[in-house]
UniProtKB/Swiss-Prot annotation:
Chemical reaction(s) catalysed: a fatty acyl-[ACP] + phosphate = an acyl phosphate + holo-[ACP]
Organism: Mycoplasma pneumoniae (strain ATCC 29342 / M129 / Subtype 1)
Gene behind the chain: plsX
Protein name per its UniProtKB record: Phosphate acyltransferase
Keywords annotated in UniProt: Cytoplasm, Lipid biosynthesis, Lipid metabolism, Phospholipid biosynthesis, Phospholipid metabolism, Transferase
GO molecular function, one term: phosphate:acyl-[acyl carrier protein] acyltransferase activity
Described purpose of this protein according to its UniProt entry: Catalyzes the reversible formation of acyl-phosphate (acyl-PO(4)) from acyl-[acyl-carrier-protein] (acyl-ACP). This enzyme utilizes acyl-ACP as fatty acyl donor, but not acyl-CoA.
Enzyme Commission numbers on file: 2.3.1.274
Pfam families: FA_synthesis
Length: 328
């Protein structure tokens, strides 16, 4: 099937060519895909030729990182809204943006609507672990506040995603907390724990502390968006610091670095967040993905790859079907 991907090329910290070059590279390996690049006239300066499956849509403004959902709505024909509208109107199957997280969460919610009345949308990212595996982490920043029931639905939707996109038939679900004891946390932690634990279709393993996350003890990590974003950014910062310290160590002792270089390169590549940059905006009636505001070509590539995987899994229809059964 020829999936159509709309890419907002404006509103992030780097040059739009980072997004465009990622699209061109990914398309070179998947020429059955169609891409719609959304930007202003300057975005496409010097871009004299595009393959027939890659088209341009012109916008007259972009969403800045300083914009709020309110100020964004005053920017007529902005690139983010235009890319979202392509999916809303059926001209594309998924939208990708590196723009403001708050604005993107708001505009996709307004444009696509919730997939279920009890669901709150979330950014779902994926994180490598020490045992050569991954876990999916949500919410990492779409919404600050969740009820226990909304946390339960995050676990339910992520369970569907993992079953559809991996070979895991019973993914382990954990709920982020400051301790593993049942009484720890706020009221919404207690309610979320109870609902996840009572659903016998889910493999819920209980609360988990942040220090155990990279040990590979869960496949899905559920959290409110405030806590989730703090933990994710802390991990990304830690990975960057370790990489910097290793480089400093090589300079001081090149011989020791030479003997360990192969192993350390593999570790650095695995935990480089640029290779794991995409987040699915889960809980909406249409498919949207978010990448970092500092995204470069590599981060856009990893986000496009995740978007393609999500499309092939027919994620939205799978979630809708499961939630319909929940009602029954």
């Amino acid at each position: 099937m020829a999936f159509r991907l709309a890419v907002d090329c404006l509103g992030f910290e780097n040059h739009p060519r980072e997004a465009i070059d990622a699209v061109l590279e990914y398309w070179s390996y998947h020429q059955e895909l169609e891409f719609i690049l959304v930007g202003d006239e300057k975005t496409f300066d010097g871009l004299d030729y595009l393959p027939k499956n890659i088209t341009k849509q012109l916008a007259s403004s972009c969403i800045d990182m300083t914009d709020t959902p309110l100020t964004a709505r005053r920017k007529v024909n902005n690139s983010m809204q235009k890319a979202i509208n392509l999916v809303r109107d059926g001209a594309a199957d998924v939208v990708i943006s590196a723009g403001s997280s708050a604005v993107y969460a708001s505009l996709t919610y307004d444009g696509f609507g919730k997939i279920h009345k009890d669901v709150k949308s979330a950014f779902m990212s994926y994180v490598p672990t020490a045992n050569n595996d991954w876990f999916y982490f949500l919410d990492v920043g779409a919404n600050k506040n969740f009820t226990g029931k909304e946390l339960y639905f995050l676990g339910l939707m992520a369970d569907i995603f993992v079953k559809k996109t991996t070979n895991k038939i019973s993914p382990r679900i954990a709920l982020l907390n400051i301790g593993t004891e049942i009484h720890k946390g706020f009221d919404y932690h207690q309610e979320g724990y109870q609902l996840l634990n009572e659903d016998k279709h889910l493999n819920f393993t209980g609360f988990i502390e942040p220090r155990f996350l990279l040990d590979g003890v869960c496949d899905i990590l559920v959290a409110d968006g405030y806590s989730g974003n703090l933990v994710l950014k802390s991990m990304e910062g830690t990975f960057k610091t370790i990489a910097r310290l290793l480089k400093q160590g090589y300079k001081r002792n090149p011989l020791a670095g030479l003997f360990s270089l192969g192993i350390l390169k593999r570790i650095a590549k695995r935990f480089d967040y640029k290779n794991n940059a995409g987040a699915v905006v889960i809980g909406l009636n249409k498919l949207a993905l978010k990448t970092h505001g500092s995204a470069d070509k590599q981060q856009f590539l990893s986000t496009i790859r995740l978007a393609h995987t999500s499309l092939k899994s027919d994620l939205i229809n799978a979630i809708k079907s499961s939630l319909d059964n929940y009602e029954k």
